[in-house]
């Protein structure tokens, strides 16, 4: 494991929540018109990602989750994991701190709802699982509200149980180095922008690979 796998990018402001729920929707990075109008309210956060020039014009993947979450429940996938799996990349890892060419960006409007560790996991478990590393990772970094973070797809993180009932807004932008796109678990772009990788139609958790 090595560090320099995550860092703060800067403050962001979330738009008024409207119940958006999209996952890994493909769009053309640098072209806001490739994103359906109802999601363009996140334009300022997308621009804050300061995507590397080598990624402009390539396919990126947008996730926005706006939902009510009960106290004591995580909004998203629980357990420590990486975005990459043993067989597929999920944003890439150029091995350096923010300013690199690949990786992914995340933000939330609720503090302490996600925890990240500034480490590189060479070989995660099935589905990116890193629960076996919990004792070795030590204290993580709890993400602050309205703060944009960059990380590689080798950076372990977990969605945390929320301290109070709330409406949580979650934003993620994954850059182009994605190995596969799971059709059953992802959102198609109604403007016709297709994934820039292999499309898998089966359940992604079938083999958790």
Predicted regions and their residues:
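A residue-level signal for beta-strand positions that form part of recognition/binding surfaces
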Residues: 11, 103, 168
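Catalytic core of non-heme Fe(II) oxygenases with the double-stranded beta-helix
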Residues: 73-145, 181-185
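N-terminal auxiliary "cap/dimerization" subdomain that precedes the catalytic jelly-roll/cupin core
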Residues: 1-59
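Hydrophobic alpha-helical segments and helix pairs
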Residues: 38-97
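Catalytic core of Fe(II)/2-oxoglutarate
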Residues: 130-208
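Structured loops at beta-to-helix junctions and adjacent beta-edge loops in soluble globular domains
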Residues: 65-67, 83-85, 107-110, 152-154, ...
């Amino acid at each position: 494991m090595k560090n320099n796998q995550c860092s703060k990018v800067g403050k962001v402001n979330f738009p008024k929540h409207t119940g958006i729920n999209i996952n890994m929707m493909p769009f053309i990075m640098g072209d806001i018109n490739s994103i359906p109008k109802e999601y363009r309210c996140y334009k300022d956060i997308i621009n804050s990602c300061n995507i590397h020039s080598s990624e402009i014009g390539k396919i990126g993947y947008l996730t926005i989750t706006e939902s009510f979450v009960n106290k004591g429940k995580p909004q998203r996938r629980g357990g420590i994991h990486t975005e990459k799996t043993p067989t597929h990349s999920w944003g890439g890892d150029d091995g350096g701190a923010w300013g690199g060419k690949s990786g992914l960006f995340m933000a939330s409007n609720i503090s302490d709802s996600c925890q990240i560790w500034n480490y590189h996991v060479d070989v995660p478990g099935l589905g990116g699982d890193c629960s076996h590393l919990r004792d070795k990772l030590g204290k993580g970094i709890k993400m602050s509200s309205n703060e944009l973070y960059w990380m590689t797809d080798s950076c372990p993180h977990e969605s945390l149980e929320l301290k109070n009932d709330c409406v949580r807004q979650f934003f993620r932008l994954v850059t182009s180095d994605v190995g596969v796109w799971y059709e059953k678990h992802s959102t198609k772009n109604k403007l016709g922008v297709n994934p820039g990788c292999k499309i898998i139609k089966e359940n992604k958790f079938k083999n958790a690979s």
